[in-house]
Regions:
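Outer-membrane beta-barrel "beta-signal"
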Residues: 254-266
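Outer-membrane pore/translocation modules
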Residues: 90-184, 236
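Structural signature of outer-membrane beta-barrel channels/translocons
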Residues: 69-73, 104-106, 122, 138-144, ...
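Transmembrane beta-barrel strands of outer-membrane/channel proteins
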Residues: 48-50, 66, 79-83, 101, ...
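Solvent-exposed loop/turn segments connecting transmembrane beta-strands
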Residues: 52-60, 88-94, 121-129, 210-218, ...
């Protein structure tokens, strides 16, 4: 992306990651892949990736996340945090970060309520600050299990969230809106396929509609493929597509992001 790979001398330094490909947008941590145990107690998961390219130009990319989940009886308390730093020739290109606090209450084996709040900044997407708060209901619609060799699930979530965004004014035309505070609907669909407790494929689609303008909506689709190496370690391939129907004028309305790395769960 930053260099013509056929004409440059390339050196890769990878820390807990084999490849990190970034096209236009920010990688969003998909909470579906991080915690899959349904037992009381504390779980911790982490993802790290780093890529260094040197030659006619110097590019450094660092991505990270640290996440906690605590379950007691029917309640789940979760904290997600992470970010991404990109520099070229020792000049910062992007520095993004996020944190999310989430609470889930399990009504029964198929249904749960959820509440969350999230704070985010992203230089590529021009966010100085993005603050979210929402709640909703999640229902399992499909649950197919054949002994221990195959498991298929499909969940549907509905809810509402309040979204406050403050954009970087220095990059926008003088008269363009830089502050919004919108109420959006939440619609998400999560499908998962697990084979022999080794391979898991998760597809998640989020649709967020501004309640007072049908032309303003956001769509995110993410596919995660995890191959379990041992009890605590999985190889992860993520492909993410994001669409914003009304992006800032300096941005395109589509992002694509892919990552290959490792997920560590304790």
């Amino acid at each position: 992306m930053y260099l013509n790979m056929f004409n440059k001398k390339i050196f890769f330094s990878v820390v807990i990651c084999f490849l990190n490909s970034i096209f236009f947008g920010q990688s969003i941590v998909n909470t579906e892949k991080l915690f899959n145990k349904n037992k009381d107690g504390l779980q911790v998961s982490s993802e790290f990736n780093s890529t260094s390219i040197s030659g006619n130009a110097s590019v450094f990319i660092l991505g990270y996340s640290l996440n906690f989940s605590y379950k007691k009886n029917k309640s789940y308390f979760r904290i997600f945090s992470g970010g991404q730093y990109i520099s070229q020739n020792k000049t910062e290109v992007s520095n993004s970060a996020f944190s999310q606090l989430r609470y889930d209450y399990q009504i029964n084996s198929k249904s749960r309520y959820f509440m969350f709040t999230q704070l985010q900044s992203n230089a590529i997407l021009l966010f100085n600050r993005r603050l979210l708060a929402g709640l909703g209901f999640r229902r399992n619609l499909i649950n197919i299990e054949r002994d221990s060799s195959l498991k298929i699930n499909f969940d549907l979530s509905l809810g509402l969230m309040q979204e406050e965004e403050v954009l970087n004014r220095s990059t926008l035309p003088q008269n363009e809106k830089y502050y919004t505070n919108y109420t959006r609907s939440i619609l998400s669909m999560v499908g998962s396929w697990k084979y022999k407790k080794k391979l898991t494929v998760i597809n998640t689609t989020y649709f967020q509609q501004y309640l007072f303008s049908f032309s303003d909506y956001r769509l995110l689709n993410e596919t995660n493929m995890l191959y379990k190496l041992n009890k605590n370690l999985s190889l992860s391939l993520d492909i993410e597509y994001r669409f914003d129907s009304e992006p800032p004028s300096q941005l395109t309305n589509k992002d694509l992001n892919s990552n290959i790395g490792l997920v560590i769960v304790f």
